[in-house]
UniProtKB/Swiss-Prot annotation:
Disulfide bonds: 46-49
Gene3D superfamilies in the record: ERV/ALR sulfhydryl oxidase domain (1.20.120.310)
Origin superkingdom: Viruses
Subcellular location: Membrane
Bilayer topology annotation: Single-pass membrane protein
Listed InterPro entries: ALR/ERV, ERV/ALR_sulphydryl_oxid_sf, ERV/ALR_sulphydryl_oxidase
Organism of this sequence: Acanthamoeba polyphaga mimivirus
Presence of the UniProt keyword Oxidoreductase in the record: yes
Needed co-factor(s): FAD
Domain annotation ERV/ALR sulfhydryl oxidase: ranges: 10-104
Role this protein plays: FAD-dependent sulfhydryl oxidase that catalyzes disulfide bond formation.
Protein name, per record: Probable FAD-linked sulfhydryl oxidase R368
Annotated catalysed reactions: 2 R'C(R)SH + O2 = R'C(R)S-S(R)CR' + H2O2
Length: 143
């Protein structure tokens, strides 16, 4: 499967997972996250990406230092993402730029005000229909 089909979602998920890493991780946390990120080399939906990710892990391993804090793990995911961006000719981001982009991506989109417009329009329509039914019913009773 082409990275263009799933890449943005994979990166968003990876960064979100890193942001969910404990600030002060336990040894169990470290092992679980190490296993999680290490397993990408076996499950990415692109064969070339699996090979490249394994190479990136060899060059930029998930060390005890990386796993010592949330900040370090988030920076590591940004570093790995930047390595991929370098090889794919995309812009590499500083940590502040990357964190801003990640937070923007993870921020829920506000619902359009058009939704409220249509809800109000439907309510007004229902009120008009009920009023017209009332007038018709009242005229039939008066006959």
């Amino acid at each position: 499967m082409s990275p263009e089909q799933w890449g943005i979602y994979g990166w968003t998920f990876s960064h979100a997972v890193a942001l969910g890493y404990p600030i002060n991780p336990t040894e169990e946390d470290k092992l679980r996250y190490y296993t999680f990120f290490n397993s990408y080399r076996y499950v990415l939906p692109c064969g070339k990406c699996r090979i490249n990710y394994a190479d990136h892990l060899n060059k930029y391993p998930l060390t005890d230092e990386v796993l010592s804090s949330r900040e370090n793990l988030v920076k590591w995911t940004i570093d790995i993402h930047n390595v991929v961006n370098y090889y794919t000719g995309k812009k590499m981001l500083t940590y502040p730029e990357a964190i801003e982009a990640i937070e923007k991506t993870l921020t829920p989109k506000k619902k359009s005000s058009y939704n409220w417009f249509f809800i109000i329009l439907i309510i007004i329509g229902i009120i008009v229909i009920i009023y017209l039914m009332y007038i018709v019913f009242k005229k039939k009773l008066n006959k």
